[in-house]
A protein has these predicted regions:
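S-adenosylmethionine
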Residues: 1-404
């Protein structure tokens, strides 16, 4: 066990709880390695000696710190005389305490005590500073979000641990009440939805309920081109439905720009007992440059790269990694994908465009702009689907079905 020094100079056992210590370590690794918190948590769970209850709390803290990082740092900096002078190792500890104070509403005396011990465990000389800062933070937390969230967009953004620019976009698009409900759901653990794998009796795989619906919109009677297939979850969903509805797997060609994802998809299909899938690696904004890719399909499914704003609770890093420039860049890529894919749809065929974004600029507005182009003018809108995050419900997804 790590040791600190008491006021008498004698060695003393650090009293920070194992769950909090683990959360500090996980979020520190996220910072140092630019790693994904979910992957670190899953890896640690396999070897952890913590009880299920302790580990689950460490996961709550780890996800929360990453999700609300910007708001937590603002809170910490409000209570420091010189924010830039604090060591990153100390800030790692204070972020855990800040999340407990602002979003978990834990008793302040317990948070202060544990926060001091967390700092003592990693930076013993800073424990005195931590004690003073944490007491200030505990008092300051009483006024959170430091404004009226019903009128101030800054206070509204703080309430849900998101950047102000994103809060403004969501309120403008959905209204304050609906945006608040979505963002409240995003602070809660994501529910797990399972789908039977008909290729392996008794086996299931995880997929969000809205993602399952999106995959169900793709016609499977003919050949299918799936763009942006990633690790193949929607590929598996389509082939599961093909076996149930057609009695056999359909023919699916997948395209992804990342070779390692194409390799993972192939391995996953083999593990799941799924046949009928051919992978291609290339840039989907220029399908003509992909060697060996057939030139016509009965259905083309674009699972577009997007902001992921419909899946914030599953991907805690998103909210503080993206900015408005990223959205603009993504919409340009999405538009180019639609233009490239349009000519690969046979006459009478179907083009399905989907995102896991809840932003209009990536969804309806982008589709409208495409339909106004010469390539898009060949298509008519046949069906539209949209969901937003809800407590205990599915994530935010968007899809349109276009007929040629």
């Amino acid at each position: 066990m790590a040791k600190g020094r008491g006021t008498s100079g004698r060695a003393r056992a650090v009293r920070a709880t194992p769950a909090r210590l683990l959360a500090v370590d996980i979020t520190r690794q996220c910072r140092l390695r630019d790693a994904y918190v979910r992957e670190l948590v899953n890896t640690r769970r396999k070897t952890s000696e913590l009880s299920h209850e302790e580990f689950d709390y460490a996961q709550v803290l780890s996800f929360g710190v990453v999700m609300c990082r910007g708001t937590l740092d603002e809170f910490i900096d409000r209570n420091l005389n010189s924010p830039h002078d604090i060591k990153p190792e100390v800030r790692d500890c204070l972020r855990v305490s800040a999340y407990e104070l602002l979003f978990l509403k834990k008793p302040s005396h317990a948070v202060v005590d544990q926060g001091v011990e967390l700092v003592r465990a990693s930076s013993p000389k800073a424990s005195g500073l931590a004690n003073a800062v944490l007491h200030k933070m505990a008092a300051d937390a009483e006024g959170f979000p430091w404004g009226d969230a019903s009128t101030s967009i800054r206070a509204f953004a703080r309430s849900y641990g998101i950047p102000k620019w994103l809060a403004r976009l969501l309120v403008r698009q959905y209204g304050r009440e609906k945006a608040a409900a979505m963002l409240a759901a995003d602070l809660l653990p994501a529910p797990t939805f399972l789908r039977d794998n008909p290729y392996q009796s008794g086996e299931r795989f995880a997929s969000d309920l809205s993602a399952q619906h999106v995959a169900s919109l793709v016609p499977l009677a003919g050949t299918v081109l799936e763009i942006g297939a990633g690790r193949g979850t929607k590929t598996a969903l389509m082939q599961a439905r093909a076996l149930e509805e057609l009695g056999h797997p359909t023919i699916i060609h997948t395209v992804d720009i990342h070779e390692f994802k194409a390799r993972l998809l192939s391995e996953r299909m083999e593990q799941m007992g799924i046949a009928g899938v051919t992978t291609h690696v290339g840039d989907a904004t220029n399908l003509d440059a992909i060697a060996g890719l057939p030139r016509a399909f009965d259905a083309v499914f674009i699972d577009a790269p997007c902001s992921g704003t419909g899946t914030l609770r599953r991907h805690p890093e998103i909210r503080w990694r993206i900015d408005p420039r990223d959205i603009e860049s993504l919409t340009q890529i999405q538009a180019r994908m639609l233009q490239s894919a349009a000519s690969y749809v046979r006459a009478g065929g179907t083009l399905v465009y989907a995102t896991c974004s809840v932003l209009d600029s990536e969804d309806d507005a982008l589709v409208r702009a495409f339909l106004d182009t010469p390539a898009g003018a060949q298509f008519t809108l046949a069906e539209r689907f949209a969901s937003v995050p809800a407590e205990g419900g599915p994530d935010g997804h968007f899809a349109v079905v276009l007929r040629k």
